[in-house]
Every structure is written in structure tokens, then in C-alpha cells.
Amino acid sequence: MLTRDPDAIEFVLHEARENDVKFIRLWFTDILGNLKGFAITVEELEGALRGGMGFDGSSIEGFIRSDERDLYALPDPNTFNILPWRPRTNAVARMFCDIMTPDGEPFGGDSRAVLRRNLDRASKLGYTYYVGPEMEYFYFEDSSGTKPLDHGSYFDQDATDISTDLRRQSVLTLEDLGIPVEASHHEVAPSQHEIDLRHTDALTMADTVMTY
């Protein structure tokens, strides 16, 4: 059974009050690697932190059968962040959740639980697992096609390129979310870019990659 640090819960409640947070997105990753979630209002936050929020797990692909549908999303207070691209009035925050069964046990199909279980096994063998991914992606002119925004190549430096400005903004947004960035640069293909994240423990990085 997972336990939450009471001080961490109080910190989240304080931060939500001080920053005019109205909505909290409860995120989790399904077994296929897709980001899922739902939003609650700040009035439900304390109850969610202490007991989780119920949802129909049978509607999530790869989770459970319809006759076993009750699951609970238990937010991890250590993942609380205010989303910087949302308005500051009635602000929006997010937390990643552990998925629990009605009897309070971790759900076996929860990706986060699978990772934590294997990290615990590694820890018992004396290993600590750190991850430092290089996130590569493309900028396109719009979401309906694949027309590149630039025709640069590896490590090109063009301060006036719109893609460079977009990459800069991406780095600043990640840092606003408390995600440390080591470096960023243009990659080999036109409009291909890379942001290198500073290494950290695997569970934190898994949440970070889903945020990214």
C-alpha cells in the first residue's frame, strides 16, 4: 500500500491556495504509453490527495474488464506543478497519479506501478537507475501536414530562425515546470530539433517525458 507524506500534501494545498489554482489535472499513463487524465476542482484536492479519485477503469484500453471497473487515481504530491501556459487567474496545475484498486493496493496494469516495482527490485540488488534522454522532435508549419519550418542541419546556428525561437520557448517552459535542461540544438534533418534533459531517477524522468 502506498503512503503519502503529510508534509508534502500540506505543501500542495498551500501552493494551490497561494497561486489561485482552480483546476488540477490528474495524469496517468496507460499500459500502451498514452497520457490519460481528468481534471478536478481545487475543492476536491485534499480528498484526492488523501484518498484518491475514483474512475471507470474499464474505459481505459488495456486496463480491466467492465466487471472490475472501479479504480482510483491517487495523486503524487511530489509531482505538483502549475502549468505555465495556462492563465494565472483560476490557474491549472497537474499531478501524476498512481492507480489503485478499491482495496488500496497498486493496480497491476499501472505503468508507474510496474516501473516502481522494477526499480525496487533493482534497489535490492544495489542498483540505482538514472535516465538522461535526448528528446528529438520536428516542428511543422501546421498540424495537418509535414511541411518543415526550417531547412537547417546538424548544429546549425541561425538566431533569426522561427524554429530556434520555438525551441528556446520550449526550454523555458520546461524550466518553468521544474524540469532541468542541459542543452538544445538543431538536429540533422530539416526542422528536427533536440532537447537534452538532465539525468535524474527513472520514475521522475518517466513523469518528465510524459509531460514533455
Predicted regions and their residues:
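Glycine-rich, acidic/polar active-site loops that bind/position phosphate-bearing ligands
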Residues: 1-212
